[in-house]
UniProtKB/Swiss-Prot annotation:
One Pfam family per UniProt: RuvX
Assigned protein family: Belongs to the YqgF nuclease family.
Key words of the record: Cytoplasm, Hydrolase, Nuclease, Ribosome biogenesis
Coiled-coil spans in chain: none
InterPro entries linked: RNaseH-like_sf (IPR012337), YqgF (IPR005227), YqgF/RNaseH-like_dom (IPR006641), YqgF/RNaseH-like_dom_sf (IPR037027)
Example of a GO cellular component annotation carried by this entry: cytosol
Subcellular location: Cytoplasm
Lineage of source species: Bacteria, Bacillati, Bacillota, Clostridia, Natranaerobiales
E.C. code: 3.1.-.-
BP terms from Gene Ontology: rRNA 5'-end processing
Alphabetized NCBIfam families for the sequence: RNAse_H_YqgF
Annotated protein name in UniProt: Putative pre-16S rRNA nuclease
Length: 141
């Protein structure tokens, strides 16, 4: 089974999915946010399409570790999603994942227009890959 990772923003949701061995994350799509109901509907369809067994959602924390306003919105989204799907949903600290994604794209000399199109997807990859790497490290210790 696969694991799906999300980078939830105010305007978009970046989506990444693991390989079947749950070792690597691949960016899949960016959902343009419409309404909570439609967003949940699109996410649910992706979960079914990719036969996902677990969801990982990036939770933005402030640099001091506290949760900010966007984190509250994400927790509300997770609560709504839990009503629709019967798989575990975990959060991971997503501090700086969007900045890491932007830096990666800048180093690759990707144009500003293209960066804007893929940054949320790449942030979702970073979120999911962080989770997958932790699982590998946990199993090796």
């Amino acid at each position: 089974m696969r694991i799906m990772g999300f980078d939830l923003g105010e305007a978009t949701i970046g989506v990444a999915v693991s390989d079947a061995l749950q070792l690597t994350a691949q960016g899949k799509t960016v959902i343009k946010r419409q309404s909570l109901e439609k967003d949940i509907e699109q996410v649910t369809k992706l979960i079914e399409d990719y036969q996902v067994s677990k969801l990982i959602v990036g939770l933005p924390k402030n640099m001091n570790g506290s949760l900010g306003q966007m984190a509250d919105q994400i927790m509300d989204f997770i609560k709504s999603l839990e009503q629709e799907v019967d798989i575990p949903i975990e959060t991971v600290d997503e501090r700086l994942t969007s900045r890491m994604a932007e830096q990666t794209l800048l180093e690759a000399d990707v144009s500003r227009k293209k960066r804007k199109q893929v940054i949320d997807k790449l942030a979702a990859v970073n979120i999911l890959q962080t989770y997958l790497d932790r699982q590998v490290n946990k199993n090796n210790n």
